[in-house]
């Protein structure tokens, strides 16, 4: 893990950027593209990518990364607890719908065994489940997904913070 900024620093930077006209959507695109570039730079063959997404902005970053990786001819599978059209956050839902239109493959609410089998095929897994706003106890399905991911032995790139850990 390579921490760069703490949560309060991130909030200050985001507020400053929005004050000078950078939208939250633009920030999400930048984060998603940066995550995709980082994944591609991890070394070795990066052709099969699994992205575990949550329902908030961290998940939105994952959907943007999925679209970017798909455009680089990676086989991308996004694992999500809900259908893209059912995501409640407007921005994350828009990013999910856009990624689906771009041809990103989606797996909704997999069983434990389905997830274990999928993770075994991944060259890299992007963890975009829970971001810097997370605190408290991890709830289903993310508790199961985190357990499967930790036991998989897969190479993992966490966006913002490893899911389940408090950034506070």
Residue ranges and their predicted role:
Residues 1-47:
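Positively charged, low-complexity intrinsically disordered leader regions
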Residues 1-5, 43-52, 57-168:
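Glycine-rich phosphate/dinucleotide-binding loop and adjoining beta-alpha-beta core of small-molecule
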């Amino acid at each position: 893990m390579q921490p760069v900024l703490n949560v309060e620093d991130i909030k200050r930077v985001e507020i400053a950027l929005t004050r000078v006209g950078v939208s939250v959507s633009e920030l999400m695109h930048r984060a998603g593209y940066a995550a995709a570039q980082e994944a591609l730079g991890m070394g070795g063959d990066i052709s099969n990518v699994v992205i575990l997404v949550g329902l908030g902005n961290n998940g939105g970053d994952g959907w943007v990364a999925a679209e970017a990786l798909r455009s680089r001819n990676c086989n991308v599978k996004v694992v999500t607890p809900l259908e893209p059209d059912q995501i409640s956050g407007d921005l994350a839902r828009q990013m999910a719908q856009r990624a689906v239109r771009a041809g990103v493959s989606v797996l909704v609410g997999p069983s434990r065994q389905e997830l274990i089998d999928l993770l075994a095929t991944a060259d890299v897994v992007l963890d975009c489940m829970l971001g810097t706003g997370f605190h408290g106890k991890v709830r289903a399905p993310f508790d199961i997904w985190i357990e499967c991911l930790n036991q998989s032995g897969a190479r993992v790139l966490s966006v913002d913070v490893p899911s389940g850990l408090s950034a506070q």
